[in-house]
A protein has these predicted regions:
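The canonical Cys-X-X-Cys-His
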Residues: 45, 53-59, 115, 144-154, ...
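N-terminal export/targeting leaders of redox proteins
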Residues: 1-39, 85, 214-226
Length: 226
């Protein structure tokens, strides 16, 4: 039942992007659901992470704020799998990640499931790079207005909706991705979300990213308990 709900949610998201007719988008759905159906091996995920990911994302998956590299520790399992599938099918643009998922060791749904479980089991990020605090109150207001209904009040994300946790994430990475959303450079997102970001002013994006980078707390992913 849970997997069926995920499938329905995912298909609805792809329909709202207008890209469901594309072969890439269809394939992302198929690959994501395949990976979620597999029994994940966190130990294999740890080995894969050490071999394939640690160079950019760091030994504890804390990312690198100064280089716009996101923290992955404690991130939602379903979301990680979906993004790896999207990179694999070039439904999300990131040249370095296209190279990573083209490697044999990281090219299959089983590897994505293993990596996602390992990452979700890690302690949450700490010491995220933040902004200057100038627009924090504006950022909090923007979050409550535009983001909390999907990402939850505390930005923990949602297991069933492929909605990522945003808290403890690096400020510069968040700003970059929000600008990508506003510019239409993220193909695998809901059109309403992209439209919301197109309507945000620069100081609202700055404040929103700064506010999220300072939010603390663990993420408890129900999918990891199955």
């Amino acid at each position: 039942m849970k997997k069926r709900l995920l499938a329905l949610t995912f298909t609805a998201v792809m329909l709202t992007t207008g890209s469901v007719a594309s072969a890439a988008a269809d394939r992302v759905v198929e690959l994501t659901m395949d990976a979620l159906d597999l029994k994940a091996d966190a130990r294999h995920g740890a080995a894969l992470y050490s071999e394939q990911c640690v160079g950019c994302h760091g030994r504890e998956a804390q990312g690198a704020g100064q280089h716009d590299v996101p923290a992955l520790a404690s991130q939602r399992r379903a979301y990680v799998i979906r993004q790896l599938a999207a990179f694999s099918e070039h439904d999300r643009i990131a040249t370095q990640m296209h190279r990573v998922v083209s490697r044999e060791a990281v090219s299959q749904p089983q590897s994505w499931a293993d990596l996602a479980l390992y990452l979700n089991n890690l302690p949450p990020p700490k010491g995220a790079h933040t902004g200057d605090g100038k627009y924090l109150s504006l950022g909090e207001a923007s979050y409550q207005q535009f983001c909390s209904s999907c990402h939850e009040e505390d930005a923990r994300g949602d297991d069933d909706g492929f909605v990522p946790s945003l808290r403890n994430q690096h400020y510069r990475y968040l700003v970059k991705e929000m600008r990508n959303l506003a510019a239409g450079h993220r193909f695998n997102v809901d059109e309403d979300l992209a439209r919301s970001f197109r309507n945000l002013k620069a100081d609202e994006i700055d404040g929103l990213a700064d506010y999220l980078s300072r939010m603390q707390g663990p993420v408890r992913d129900r999918a990891s308990e199955e």
